[in-house]
A protein has these predicted regions:
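Residues in the helix-turn-helix
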Residues: 34
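HTH-adjacent hinge/linker in prokaryotic transcriptional regulators
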Residues: 2-9, 13-22, 26-29, 39-56
């Protein structure tokens, strides 16, 4: 879980933003609910900013 969350942060930092559909392509084995929980956690810890349809 922590590895996946760090990968999400790295993707956002590299590209400046990422859409939810792009996250699904990077993590096809992970459910939508889990990815949304990851985004919520990363936003709450101020590692990313959640936006409609993804993160930046």
């Amino acid at each position: 879980m922590e590895n996946r969350r760090q990968q999400i942060v790295d993707l956002v930092n590299r590209d400046g933003k990422i859409s939810f559909s792009e996250l699904k392509q990077f993590f096809p084995e992970v459910s939508d609910v889990t990815l949304r929980k990851d985004l919520k956690y990363l936003d709450s810890t101020m590692q990313i900013v959640r936006v409609h349809g993804g993160a930046k």
